[in-house]
A protein has these predicted regions:
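Membrane-interface alpha helices of multi-pass inner-membrane proteins
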Residues: 28-33, 135-149, 163, 169, ...
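Catalytic lumenal/periplasmic loop and adjoining terminal transmembrane helix
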Residues: 242, 357-517
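Perimembrane helix-loop-helix junctions
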Residues: 4, 9, 167-191, 202-234
Length: 524
């Protein structure tokens, strides 16, 4: 009985490129141009801001506490710094420059996915070619991958290196392959790069090591060469980190000491050991997480020698013993697991073998279609509500040669108590300037105090800083900011960053206030 007949959309090849990879490329292109902001703050504070400082646009002493603690590897920031430098050569707008970084990220993920599907046999024995093709389709069209393909976070960066690793092991360490020392050395190097892309990927290397020893029965000589390759790559990145931090540093050791020994990570929240098992079935973010959990659970019994089985459970249990848990921590492995889903579909088909397979697996076609639909929606949807507004105001400033002054809240960092803006400094430009609440308070004291009057606060700050356009995120729902009290301000938008209720008041400029109000509401 045939498990899966590829629908017309995915049937055949266009040249040597499979249509589902073309779909992934399309989602990546859309994400580059339409997906503004980031999925998680770490994407900026630990990567883009670091890269921005590396190319000389930002200040090292204004980076997040991770820089002072010297716990962040510089591999991905330098990966982002090169296209970022090119982007700022083309335009001084950060909203243009970041597109170059997203484009490189999307291209890298596409190359890694293509290599994995071409070289890795997914290490799931018993799947026929059609089922393997289905696994590739499910991977390339998954909502999680579509959502992150044009991101710059470490989760998708690590997932791309994992796919390269799985493709390499599939090509060189299959059951019919003879092991060679050079293959083990380069495998170790690849693991070293993956480890410095995200330190939690050490669980993957541990799983691979035990798999090579127990299942593949690699010799101690070959395993030692593998470790040598890992150490060689690690040494290169230790030197890079030491150069960027201005002194010898082993960032993995610092990371472990800060987050595990000192418990800094736990200050962001702790969860019981079983939290991930609960989230598999309840979290809306983990699209397909329950299916991955069910499939990999079955694989423990029916495919215990599968490398993916070892990697998945090492990764899950390794993260389960750490007190601080976030669903995104599992993304690097969950992104890859759809290639295993056809195994579950095959088991179901055997249970209902008396039913025509075309009728049994019509839900598979629906799953692919729905994944594509949601993937496209995700690619078009801006990630950060406030960044769409910032980009728009930046364009206003450039068109009218005016400055936009931003006043936003700050948040405490858990380790040192330093305060950094919620919106990264990366998005500041000659047309987007910053004023902090403490500056406003100081100005109030010098003028005899007007802290109880939000309208006078806005008026005074705008007048003293002399911006032609002023943007405020003051914590107030007071709509009394009218033309009578703010007649020296060209543009005021109140409480836009922290609220979905937008109050826009337009003075002097040719911007249509009603249109801006509707636009801002639509973006938020």
């Amino acid at each position: 009985m045939q498990l899966y007949k590829p629908p017309l959309l995915f049937n055949g090849l266009i040249g040597n490129v499979k249509p589902h990879l073309l779909y992934l490329a399309l989602v990546g292109v859309i994400g580059v141009f339409f997906s503004i902001g980031y999925l998680y703050p770490d994407e900026h504070f630990q990567i883009i801001e670091f890269a921005n400082a590396a190319i000389g646009r930002g200040s090292f002493d204004k980076l997040a506490w991770e820089y002072g603690s010297r716990i962040r590897p510089w591999l991905q920031p330098w990966f982002a710094a090169i296209p970022l430098k090119l982007g700022f050569f083309v335009s001084d707008s950060p909203f243009v420059a970041i597109k170059f970084v997203k484009a490189l990220s999307a291209f890298f993920v596409l190359v890694a996915t293509s290599y994995f599907l071409r070289c890795g046999n997914y290490d799931v024995d018993g799947l026929n070619p059609k089922e393997r093709q289905l696994g590739g389709v499910l991977l390339a069209t998954s909502v999680l991958l579509s959502q992150m393909v044009a991101s710059t976070n470490s989760e998708i960066f690590a997932a791309a290196w994992l796919m390269l690793l799985l493709g390499y092991t599939g090509r060189n360490f299959g059951p019919d392959r003879n092991e060679k020392s050079a293959q083990h050395f380069w495998c170790g190097c690849l693991n070293g790069v993956m480890f410095f892309s995200r330190f939690q990927m050490g669980f993957v290397y541990a799983a691979l090591g035990f798999w090579l020893l127990v299942i593949r029965r690699s010799s101690l000589k070959h395993l030692s060469i593998n470790v040598l390759g890992f150490l060689t790559a690690s040494l290169a990145f230790v030197l890079l980190d030491s150069y960027m931090y201005g002194g010898f540093v082993v960032t993995p050791a610092n990371y472990f000491h800060a987050n595990i020994i000192e418990g800094v990570a736990s200050r962001f929240g702790i969860s019981p050991w079983y939290a991930y098992f609960f989230e598999f079935g309840t979290s809306g973010r983990l699209v397909g997480g329950f299916l991955s959990f069910a499939t990999l659970t079955v694989m423990v019994f029916v495919r215990p020698k599968s490398l993916l089985t070892w990697i998945f459970w090492f990764f899950v249990f390794g993260h389960s013993v750490v007190a601080h848990k976030e669903e995104r921590f599992l993304f690097p492995v969950l992104i890859v697991t759809p290639v295993c889903w056809p195994l579950m579909f095959g088991l179901v088909s055997k249970v209902v073998k008396k039913t025509d397979s075309g009728k049994v697996f019509w839900p598979v076609r629906v799953l692919v279609a729905v994944s594509c639909l949601f993937g496209l929606i995700t690619a078009f949807r801006p990630r950060g509500q406030k960044y769409g507004v910032l980009e728009y105001l930046d364009s206003i400033g450039r068109a009218q040669h005016q400055a936009v002054c931003l006043d936003w809240d700050v948040k405490d960092q858990p380790k040192s108590g330093e305060r950094v803006p919620i919106v990264p400094a990366f998005y500041q430009s000659p047309y987007v300037q910053v004023m902090f609440p403490q500056d406003l308070d100081h100005a109030n004291k010098r003028t005899g105090g007007c802290a109880d009057d939000p309208a006078r606060q806005v008026w005074y700050t705008a007048k003293k800083t002399s911006p032609e356009v002023y943007f405020s995120s003051l914590k107030t729902s007071d709509a009394s900011l009218t033309c009578q009290t703010t007649n020296n301000i060209d543009l005021v938008i109140v409480d836009l960053i922290s609220s979905d209720r937008v109050h826009a008041f337009i003075h002097k400029t040719g911007v249509n206030g009603e249109q801006l109000y509707l636009w801002a509401c639509r973006r938020t």
